Every structure is written in C-alpha cells, then in structure tokens.
From Swiss-Prot:
EC number: 2.5.1.6
Lineage, uppermost ranks: Bacteria, Bacillati, Actinomycetota, Actinomycetes, Mycobacteriales
Gene of this entry: metK
Catalyzed reaction equations: L-methionine + ATP + H2O = S-adenosyl-L-methionine + phosphate + diphosphate
The protein's annotated pathway: Amino-acid biosynthesis; S-adenosyl-L-methionine biosynthesis; S-adenosyl-L-methionine from L-methionine: step 1/1
Protein name as annotated: S-adenosylmethionine synthase
GO MF terms, alphabetically ordered: ATP binding; magnesium ion binding; methionine adenosyltransferase activity
Entry GO CC: cytoplasm
Pfam families for the chain: S-AdoMet_synt_C, S-AdoMet_synt_M, S-AdoMet_synt_N
Family that this chain belongs to: Belongs to the AdoMet synthase family.
Record's cofactor remark: Binds 2 divalent ions per subunit.
Binding residues for ATP: H21, D180, G181, K182, D261, R267, K268, A284, K288
Residues given in the record as Mg(2+) binding sites: D23
C-alpha cells in the first residue's frame, strides 16, 4: 500500500457474495415469494422479510393480494436450487423447518398509495398523480463509463467472480465446493479517477472437509479468477500482472450458510448496488413490490444515471430522488457529475434535462419500466445493476438521445 500511495494511486475495494451466503438466501426467498405473488396478482402489495438460521427459515411481512401461493414450497424449492439439499452441507431444504407469519398490509399505508395526497388535496393533474409513494425516503443511482455496463469496475469484477464461483460449483468444474462464498476486488485508481491496476483479489468459498487449502487455491485461481480475467478482456486497459490473490485466507471454511451465520433479507445493500462507489439511501430491495420506492425509485435512478452517461453528458453521474409517503411527485432531485460533465454543461442543466425527459412519479416509473412482472428473483444475488445476463428494463439507455435533444446537442 505504501508503494501505491507514493505513486499517486489510490485503492478502492468492493465485495460480492454468492447466492449461498445466508443473507442472500433470504433475499432470494423474499424475491421468489414476490415473483410468485406478482405472477398471480400483478397488483399485489408485498413486503416480505426472511430470516434463516440453523435448520430454520422464518418468513414474515405484510401482503395484500387476491392470489395465493404456497410459501413453504417456494422456500424449500429455492433452498434446493441454491444447493442446500443435504445435511452434509449444513442445511437441507427438504427437511428444515419453515414458519410463515404474514399479515395484511396496513390499511392506512394502502390508502395513501391507492389515493395520493395530490388526489386528496385536489392537486392531481392526470392518472399518474393517483398513486402515492409507498414510503418516504431517498434513493440514489449511479453510472460510470469505466465499464461496458456503465458500472464501477470493482463491483463489476466482484460480481463476475461470485457468479463464476457458483457456476463452477453447480457444473462440477470444481468439485468439493459448497454454496456459501464471498469475493472481493481491490483496484488502484489514478489521479484522474480511472482504474489502472488490479491490486488484490479475495475469494472465500465453503468447501467439503476433505480438501487441502493448496488444492483449493489452485482450483480457484485457474477456474474462477483466471477465467474471469480472461473473459473480461481487461488486459488491454488494466494492469493485471502481479496482483495478490487470497483464497480462504482464514483457513478452513467447511461450516457455512445458515449453520455458520444467521441470514436476513436486506443486509447486503452495498453488494446489491454499486459496491460503495456511490451513496446509498439505506433502503433494501428484496421482497418489496414496486409501489415501494425503496425499490422502484432506486431502479429509476439507475435508469436516469445510465442514460446521462450513455448520452455522453458526463463520464460519471450520481442522481438522488426523494419522496414523501402518499405523495406522487418527488420532493427532490439532485444530479452530481463530479466535474466530468461534457459540452460545457452544468449539473443544473443536466438536472433540468432529466426532469424534462423522465417522469419520476411512482405510477409513471412502474408503467415505463413495466415493473408489475415477476422479474425480481434473478436480481437477488450478483447485483441489481449492470447485469448483462438479465434483461432488466432499468438498464436500457432508451432516453439518451432525448436527453441530448433537450440539451440541443443533436
């Protein structure tokens, strides 16, 4: 690190976790239940939290729906899909306890969403004023041109490593692996804020008891880390020589999943978003239907930020939106480009263009992004943004030209 500081470089780190991490198990269960409910009732109101510990899954929350889903079966099927299918790995979806404690959504909250403050005060102007935000809060979105997906490179690489770690386990490319795991990537950034060197990669993976750490290191390096670095094509833009690789630096990792640590929905919000490169409003995503602006507002902000960068208006963009519970119109919007704006544009000019091009009322977001669909379970692990393996509507850059037109950039 001292050599890095002396060279004027700064280190930035992001982490990811696999779908077998206890918190991610809970996110996956919550979003699987959400998707199932949206499949039978697209207008279902859902707020589902999951807790897991040794031998037990507990599902709690509030739901308003005209449909029915068999939650215990959804829980068990998801656990087995992840890989917790035997007591030998520390958790068995077929035999674990599953308890469900779900009540009805508060009528007061429901009323504020169904009939906004604008409607109740006579301020409404069109149908999109009808629905109020499901809660107060602030949400951030971010984009940067340092990767093809317009995501920060540290979290992008960390997710790719975590996905590959799961892939080699499920396809038996590497034997003796178990579902729980984490990845971490440290990159050196130069004075202009560009990533220039891979500094450290950490991979921690649950494994069977009869493997040596030397064997595991070789397998992870060849089939996970080296594979991802080749697949990413970073050699031409990033110095990947001489990086430090740490595999299970704490030693043996046999006990994992819910047997190793209790899990809870919504505890990996930095993994879910930008790996710490951008600010976060604090609200989690999983288990929440899109009337909850914690989710839909954050997705809209990624959509906005990505279009700003895709339009060439800035190299980096962070946007914030804020809502009041029961109000349709946002109470605030903020755009920050960190001095990277192009064409002599100010952040205020870009902000005005965003307000002209994007309708950020919850009903409009839900309609424009078509969010009343079962599209959420796939986002529960490996990030909600920058996913080139999923077709997520908030990743579209369909408003980039409109932003340029509003700013008379042609």
């Amino acid at each position: 690190m001292s050599e890095t500081a002396a060279s004027g470089l700064r280190l930035f780190t992001s982490e990811s976790v696999t779908e077998g991490h206890p918190d991610k198990i809970c996110d996956a269960i919550s979003d699987t239940i959400l998707d199932a409910l949206l499949s039978v009732d697209p207008h279902a109101r859902v707020a589902v939290e999951t807790v897991t510990t040794t031998g037990l899954v507990h599902v709690v929350g509030e739901v308003r729906t005209s449909g029915y889903v068999e939650i215990p079966k959804l829980v068990r099927d998801k656990l087995i899909e992840i890989g917790f299918n035997s007591s030998e790995v520390g958790f068995d979806g077929r035999t674990c306890g599953v308890s469900v404690s779900i009540g009805e959504q508060s009528q007061e909250i429901g009323a504020g969403v169904d009939q906004s403050h604008e409607v109740r005060s006579g301020e409404n102007t069109d149908a999109d004023d009808q629905a109020g935000a499901g809660d107060q809060g602030l949400m951030f979105g971010y984009a940067t041109n340092e990767t093809a997906t317009l995501m920060p490179l540290p979290i992008d690489l960390a997710h790719r490593l975590a996905r590959r770690l799961t892939q080699v386990r499920k396809t038996s490319v590497v034997s003796h692996l178990r579902p729980d795991g984490k990845t971490q990537v440290t990159l050196a950034y130069d004075e202009s804020g560009r990533p220039v060197r891979l500094d450290t990669v950490v991979v921690s993976t649950q494994h069977d008891p009869d493997v040596t750490q030397e064997w595991l290191f070789a397998q992870i390096k060849e089939h996970v880390v080296d594979w991802v670095l080749r697949d990413s094509g970073l050699e031409s833009t990033l110095d990947i020589s001489g990086y430090s690789l740490l595999v299970n630096p704490s030693g043996s990792f046999v006990v994992g999943g819910p047997m190793g640590d209790a899990g809870l929905t919504g505890r990996k919000i930095i993994v879910d978003t930008y790996g710490g490169m951008a600010r976060h409003g604090g609200g989690a995503f999983s288990g929440k239907d899109p009337s909850k602006v914690d989710r839909s507002g954050a997705y809209a902000m990624r959509w906005v930020a990505k279009n700003i960068v895709a339009a060439g208006l800035a190299d980096r963009a962070e946007v914030q939106v804020a809502y009041a519970i029961g109000r349709a119109k946002p109470v605030g919007l903020y755009v920050e480009t960190f001095g990277t704006a192009k064409f002599g544009l100010t952040d205020e000019q870009i902000q005005d263009a965003v307000l002209h091009v994007f309708d950020l009322r919850p009903a409009a977001i839900i309609r424009e992004l078509d969010l009343l669909r079962p599209i959420y379970a796939g986002t529960a692990a490996y990030g909600h943004f920058g996913r080139d393996d999923l077709k997520l509507p908030w990743e579209n850059t369909d408003r980039a030209e409109q932003l340029r037109d509003v700013l008379s950039l042609g």
